[in-house]
Amino acid sequence: MAASALHQTTSFLGTAPRRDELVRRVGDSGGRITMRRTVKSAPQSIWYGPDRPKYLGPFSEQTPSYLTGEFPGDYGWDTAGLSADPETFARNRELEVIHSRWAMLGALGCVFPEILSKNGVKFGEAVWFKAGAQIFSEGGLDYLGNPNLVHAQSILAIWAVQVVLMGFVEGYRVGGGPLGEGLDKVYPGGAFDPLGLADDPDTFAELKVKELKNGRLAMFSMFGFFVQAIVTGKGPIENLFDHVADPVANNAWAYATNFVPGK
């Protein structure tokens, strides 16, 4: 969900920040790096406000008072009260968006190599949970199966590069830009929206909802991929092919009732 704290809501969420506050945080230089623009009214969308769709439709229970429909992806469900505290709520919104994005990338990375492999593209190992182990093989790990792209033989080197690169990106995000310009930590815009897809405020509001809906599905997908890997020892595409070939013998119920850990 949106990551800015509740007391920092923009007019996109109902309260317009004053220009002097933006100048104080960003500067009045007229440069390209600015905070995410604001608008004069709340999003005109069915996904926001008190009349937004709820998690059980007309059968939903009373919506908690702190779930007002102000933020994207709010279906009025918080049985455990995890978002009752405003600071926790803001933190959870940020975490959900970040995990959603990683899950969408991860889900694509799990299925795409298998799809390519099924269509004749050569890989050292196309199954996602087996691919990383290739670095321990004698020949090492070749990116896309091509030693001329990236050839790796040291797990420590990969770990170090990942820490540095991901640390840099996360530092950029948390710091609000390379120089601490105060960019939104979750929706910075600028170079992260080169096509200008979020220029229109109402379109931006819809895209936030779509991102979360797809991200939540991707997180469930990743969980399913983990379970499939443990239970079947196969990738998601191979499992799909097995299910289509014999739906009765290859389905979740059949595996659950015959699964023996360690075998």
From Swiss-Prot:
Entries under SUPFAM superfamilies matching the protein: Chlorophyll a-b binding protein
Modified residues (Phosphothreonine): 38
Key word Plastid present: yes
Binding site for chlorophyll a 6: 243, 252
Coiled-coil annotated residue ranges, if any: none
Binding residues for chlorophyll a 2: 99
Disulfide topology: none
Subunit structure: The LHC complex consists of chlorophyll a-b binding proteins.
UniProt-recorded name of the protein: Chlorophyll a-b binding protein, chloroplastic
Organism, scientific name: Oryza sativa subsp. japonica (Rice)
Name of the coding gene: RCABP89
